[in-house]
Each structure stands twice: as C-alpha cells, then as structure tokens.
Amino acid sequence: MRQAKLAAQQRPSEAGFGAQGGDPRRGVDMDLSTCVNRYGPAPAAVEALHSIPPADILLHPYDAAERLVEVYRWATGVNGGAMIAGRGASEFIWAMGRELDHADVQVPLPAYTDYLKAFPGRGFTVSGEQIPTVEQVDAALGAGPLVIVSNPHNPTGTLLNPRELIAVADAHPAATLVVDESYIDFTSHPVGWSTLGCDIPNLVVLQSTSKFYGIAATRAGMAWCADHEQLKRLFGLQENWGLSGVDVHVACAAVRDFRWAAHSRSRMQSDSAWLADVLSGIPGLRPHRNANVHFQYAFCQRAEDVAEIFRNHGIGVRVLGAAHGANPDALRIVAPRSDERERFLGAVADVAAALAASGEAEPAQRA
C-alpha cells in the first residue's frame, strides 16, 4: 500500500516551471532570480566555517538538530510548542509530499515552485486571483484538510497579517494551515510578523536560514507547531543524522549575528524601494510594489522576452507563468546592490526600448 502511494506521487516533470532561481544553467553572473541575500554570506558564517573544530567534521552529527533548535528558540524567544530541525523548508515540503494524500492538499495560487512540484495539480484559486489574501486562504481551508502558503509570499512579496492567518486557521479546526516563513527575516520586524508561538494546534510554521543569511549552500531550518502530534503526522519519521553538523555550525553562527542581520536588512529594504521605483517607470510592466521583502514582482505579457534581454546582459531574473498560477506571466526580480545598479539600468534601457518597439508597451501602472 505504501509503495503504491509513493509510486502515485512521484516527483513530476520540470516542464512548465522553468529554471528555478539560482540555477547555474542560466549562464549569468548577476543572478537576481534567486532570493538569496546579495549581501551574504553572513561574515559570522564564513568565520565559523573557517574555524570549525576538526572533531566536528570527524564525528557523526549527534547533537546537530538539538543545537539548531536551541538557536532558533533563542533567536525567536519561542520556548513553547514542538520544534524540529530539518534541511531547510524543503525537507518538510517534500516530506509532506510523501506522507500526505495529495487530494487533501490545497496550494493557493500563485505559488512557490516546490509546493506545486510536491503536490502536482493541487493549485487552488477562487476566481483567478493573482495576489494572495487571507480570504483566499480561508476559502482553501474550507475546501481541504491542509493548506500550504508562504508568508511573506513567494513570488509576489505580499505580507499577510499573521493575526488574521491565525484566526482563519482557528476557524477551521478540522484543517491544518502550514505557513512557510522562509522570507520572514527580510521583513522589518521578523518576530512581530511571524505566526510562530501561537497557541492553536492546527497551524504549522516552517522557517529556513538559507535565504536571509546568504548561506543557501547549507541546508538548515525548522518546523514548529503548538501540537507535536501535527509534526509527526505531516513529516513522518525523520532519518538518523539527517542534518549536516557542518551546515548547523555555520547556520547557528549566522543566526547569532544580530548586528549584521539588522544592517543587511536595512540595505536590502533601501535596494528594494529603488527597484520598485525603476520597475514602475517601465511601460509594459505592471508592478505589484511591496515594501516587505528584497524582491519585486511585476506582471508582463512578454516576461520571457524581457528575461532574455536581461540574460544578454548577464543578469538573471525569474519568470513565473501558468504553471505557477500567474496570469499574465510575471517577473520576480531581487533588488540589485547599490554597486550593481548602473549595470542593471543598462539592461532596463534595452528592456524599455524592446517593449516600446514591439508596440505592446502600455503605460506603467501598479497592480
């Protein structure tokens, strides 16, 4: 029975999703398609990697999971509830893909690629909405026993009110809401915008160190719920020594570096505001401006063509299309650093010229 279930839930084809952010096959040297902090890696992470004791490499990582949970509880101030460590949010997403009946899962659209790969065909929409809302999440919870949504939202950058998410989960006690907070550290107040620490038993939180701390080569994160039985049900039995001791050593050092985190966060917020202004001035783009995270999202009928122009300048941007629930197609672009702006603007000039020459450019407007 178990083998039949797994066979029916094999990893789907990559067709339709395009190259994910950071994929080296893009052939670019300024990769704004991946949402990793461009000011990373955190210096403390690099220092930790250089100074790791030989014994920590020699021996099995017996206490790696415990150390990661300890630093997460320290950083967030959440001491209650059940928390387990894993290899980023990805481990938990794919574990659910193996453990759950896919027919029970709703993924509000548009959505992060891995949700739609782990749960093929489970995209949820009420009326073709393109920007997530709490009302959409509420409707999804009413339609199925489990809903997974990212907050801040990938790919749109929308930030839903955590208290409202808790309230809608509480209103559907027979369903479970999984909130992936992989981008929460990019917000102005990560603890305040998180659902972590709520007292309802049917809300699960995922977090990851990979993106914000600029250490995506390491795989470290956690899952939390007020009810430990939920974690067992969703993720099953974790493997022995599943976490790399080296990854955890690096991740813990990065999380403890509050000063760098605050400085980096401020710089990215400034960069993102600059990018929003630039995109708002390009006819043919319809930006959904946000002040929540380090990337911007814009609808564009010719998103693939625009991405190719950027690629010709050695710049990677992410195209979202029908496979993600985006209609029309859209672009997700991480804000370039201040020292990268001149080169980025050169590509923008070519994009604007190409859209104008095509006759398809419309006056720039905000979503």
Which role fits each region the language model picked out?
Residues P43, R302-I309, D339-F344:
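Short, conserved charged micro-motifs
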Residues M1-H60, W74, R366:
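N-terminal "arm"/small-domain region of PLP-dependent enzymes with the aminotransferase-like
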Residues G40-A42, N202-G281, P287-H288:
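PLP-dependent aminotransferase class I/II
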Residues R163, N312, H324-A367:
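PLP-dependent enzyme catalytic core of the Aspartate aminotransferase-like
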Residues R98-S150, P155:
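PLP-dependent aminotransferase-like
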Residues I131-T187:
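Active-site phosphate-binding strand-loop segment of PLP-dependent enzymes
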Residues Q269, G281-H313, L331, A335:
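Conserved PLP-binding catalytic core of the aspartate aminotransferase-like
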Residues A65-V69, N79-A103, G221:
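Conserved beta-loop-alpha segment that forms the PLP phosphate-binding cup at the N-terminus of a helix
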